[in-house]
Each structure stands twice: as structure tokens, then as C-alpha cells.
Amino acid sequence: MRCGLCPHRCLIPEQERGICKVRENRGGRLFALTYGKVSAVQFDPVEKKPLYHFHPGRPILSIGSVGCNFHCGFCQNYHLVECSVPLSPMPIPDLVRAARREGAVGISYTYNEPLIGFEFVMDCAREFRRAGMANVLVTNGYVLPEPLAELLPLVDAMNIDLKSMDPEFYRKICGGTLAPVLDTIRESAKSTHVEITTLLVTGENDSEESIRAVVDFVAGVDPEIPLHFSRYTPMYRFTAPSTPPARLAAAHRIAREKLPYVYVGNYPLEGAENTVCPSCGAVVVRRHGYRTDRFGLAGNRCVSCSAVLRFVV
């Protein structure tokens, strides 16, 4: 039985599972083993996804399960990838009620790779759309065009990991390929709000050349896509030291040459969390950790100069 969800296109023998560990061949049919089962449910600031230009300051219901179709040696959630945490059943109506009760903007499919649980995400997304709430994907983007096209009409925002522009990085470190991720970014940016995150791993993808390659790609898709550089810390199989602050500052400086919305996460780099109006230079959103003050925004316009900014509010 061949799976048609992600570019691995796993050929799965009877009673066995694909690379993601959550899709099993039973009698010539694929079963989604984690359907309706979650490893974590909590409310987060939407900035934690990270999404800085999508309903800033609002809470969002965040859910995750287990498994992944990548196996990155530096994974920050490796316990979920290895399916080593307990799962609890979670009916979709309960999620809708919880989000509504807490005044959440919607739901975020996050923590592990959500697209390997495609069927549950689809069903959940339909119910949240009917309830008038948003659907957010935090994803590695490793999905085939057909399922992506089916899901995108239900998606209101995405944060997509772009780990590197080096195909060898994806092959050796992640166990995947780069091209499908780039295709996902290009296609998603046509129809929904997209932000990009690059984890800068010391000695692997933090050179100036690597950073410029990421920036050039994002600028080529749409220069107004917000780009987040995140600080790596030693985790799982990687023991290299944490990303030096100087590299984070350099990445921010390099990216700002071509992109107006560039941020640094997991490290308090002065000014690198705030949003500045590209037209007049005024600070429109000030952030400290996950605390957000959108004092300079009126809707999606700059209060100082009335320029329309790339925000969904």
C-alpha cells in the first residue's frame, strides 16, 4: 500500500507503518492511528506559533499529537516525534467549545507535524470554519500538492519551517528533500497568510551564505512575508552550542536588507521582536516575550502615516 500524503510516498507492507509512524496498512487500507488523539491541548498567545502578523495579541487553542515525517537531529520536540508520550481522545466538538469559551481566535495544529494527521486536521478545520474561527498550521511543509490543495481553502494562516536552502541539509539532517517544502511555501502564499521560521543551527545553516539564500528565496516569493529566525539550543542528537547572539543579530541585519518584517525568537535581541512600519519607520507593534502592544496599528494601518501593512486583524 503506497501512502499519497507526503513526498516520501511510503510503500507500506501489511500491518506496518510509514516513516511518520502513525499511518498503518490494515488489509490494504491506510489507518490514521492518531485520529482524534492528542498529546497536548493548551491556550497560547498566537505569537508563540510564531505568528506576529495574524491577530496580534489574541489567544489561540493549540493542539498536537505525535509523529513526524522528518527526523531532524536537532528536533526541539523529539519526544513527540518518537511517539513516546501518552495520547488522550479529544472530540472535535469539545475543542470548538473550549476555543469559544476562552475567546480564542481559533485553533493551531502544532507541536508535532500536523499534516501527518491529515484526516483529523481536515475534519477539525471544517468544524472550526463553520464556527467562525480560524485554522492555523505550524508545519514543516513536507506534503504533496494534492492534499495541500484540499486543505488550503480551510487554512487561515501558516507558519512554515524553512530549515535551509541546502538540499543536502534536508537529506542528511532531516531525512527529506527541499524542493517540496519550497513548493508548499509558494503555493500556500498565494491563498493564505504565511510566515516563515528558520532555526539557526550552529555550524549547520547559520553562515552568511546560508542566511542570504533563505532571505533571497522568501523575497522572491513575497518580500512582505514575515521571517522569523529562531535560536537553536542543544537538543536530541545535536550537541553544538546554542546559536551565538552575534549570529542572530547578523541574520536580522542581513534579512532587513530585503525584507521589512524580520524577527528573532528564543533570544531577547533588542528591537528584533517589534514591527516597524516600512513606510515611515514608526514602531507599530511592540513585543516583549509574548506580551504584545499594538499601539501603532489602527486595523491594519499605521497610525502615524496610514500606510496599509501586512496584518490580518
Annotate each PLM feature.
Residues 92-243:
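Conserved AdoMet/S-adenosylmethionine-binding subsite of the radical SAM
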Residues 1-65, 77-82, 273, 283-285, ...:
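N-terminal [4Fe-4S]-dependent radical SAM core
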Residues 52-53, 149, 294:
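Short secondary-structure boundary/capping segments
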